[in-house]
Amino acid sequence: MKSYEVNFDGLVGPTHNYGGLSYGNVASQSNSQQSSNPKEAALQGLQKMKALMDMGFVQGVLAPQERPDVAALRNLGFSGTDAQVIQQAAKHAMPLLVASCSASSMWVANAATVSPSADTADGRVHFTAANLNCKYHRSIEHPTTSRVLGAMFADQKHFAHHAALPAVAQFGDEGAANHTRFCRDYGEAGVEFFVYGRSAFDTRYPAPQKYPARQTLEASQAVARLHGLQDDGVVYAQQNPAVIDAGVFHNDVIAVGNGEVLFYHEDAFLNTEQMLGELHGKLGKLGGHFQSVCVPRAQVSVEDAVRSYLFNSQLLSRADGSMLLIVPEECRANERVWQYLQGLTASGGLIREVKVFDLKQSMQNGGGPACLRLRVALNETELAAVNPGVIMTAPLYDTLTQWVDKHYRDSLRETDLADPQLLLECRTALDELTQILKLGSVYPFQIN
């Protein structure tokens, strides 16, 4: 049976703004308070989805969250009508209003961790929504994330959904941004690779000093248990604390994997040789041949990697066995990074082609091509069981483009978030979107 790796990209929400909410994310912090363009952001994301579909990849779409999150503000003590809640928050606690309006759910690499059926004990695809407890504005996402994923992957014969881990620092979980999977074929058993920044309970593990480590070893282990993974199909690796302090807040900012290949920076991990040996050995027992592509610090510094988002790229398998790297425009703008990529594709290795996309609106908030997608490996039967409304087609692309043009503003500043009209605009748009994507009622305003 044929299997696919399907990329489900996050649709950028109507409140996309530069709130500077993510400490440890250099781009997010440095572009704080600038005027954003939600319409352009959403269209840039849709163009990437359509381009991958046109290249022959199966492409899906993941709906944004309801924002402003009035329920979250009510939980923090604001009351009255929805408009009054927003006005009170704007007057007395503007940072809370900004957080409740964040469109960060577009970065669906943080939505969940996904294990395909070939790896799990019960032969189903498993999803665990990420608690994202390190940042308040993201910690409020997982209830809606779970409902949206449940509406997309509803058939319990094929799909299993787990609630987010306990919302405490010891189980900080950032989802697929710290997880990848190596395999010979998407439909065969593989090795799941969990990357953590610190241990919550074992002080022998080093930790970053400047920025927080958002993923714990204990969270990764819990997800592996929930998904019914075997020990011989799992590798845990610690990210280098020094690169976290340099702005590498998720592993997908310093490494990307696909198939049998890990593309990573020389400084990405601790105990790199041991980690590579374990990956090689475990994948070898499953009939695969693990290969690594290391980018030397002498050619690309960590600073250049963070600035260009070289590793926050999509590594995709072509039908001929070669690989394609999808990178943001910022890679072409960085002379050292672009020179490295030109040499990489000319070397005759597995990565034969680089395609560049303009994702400036997302990039300025600290999210590149890899942040915008959640990978789900599915066999033909499972793909047929996915809600067809969320699979990208040419007609769906046209419909969503028209939907964005109709509902989204082309400029948004922090002061605009206090406008009660924005709430009505967003709810009207999302109500229409759930009909387009055939999701049913998934948003709080539709349920309560």
Swiss-Prot record:
Keywords for the protein's UniProt record, in alphabetical order: Arginine metabolism, Hydrolase
Claim: Protein biosynthesis is one of the keywords in the record: no
Source organism, top-level taxon: Bacteria
A GO MF label: N-succinylarginine dihydrolase activity
Reactions that this protein is recorded to catalyse: N(2)-succinyl-L-arginine + 2 H2O + 2 H(+) = N(2)-succinyl-L-ornithine + 2 NH4(+) + CO2
Quaternary structure, from the entry: Homodimer.
Name of the protein described by the UniProt record: N-succinylarginine dihydrolase
Organism per entry: Pseudomonas fluorescens (strain SBW25)
Organism lineage string: Bacteria, Pseudomonadati, Pseudomonadota, Gammaproteobacteria, Pseudomonadales
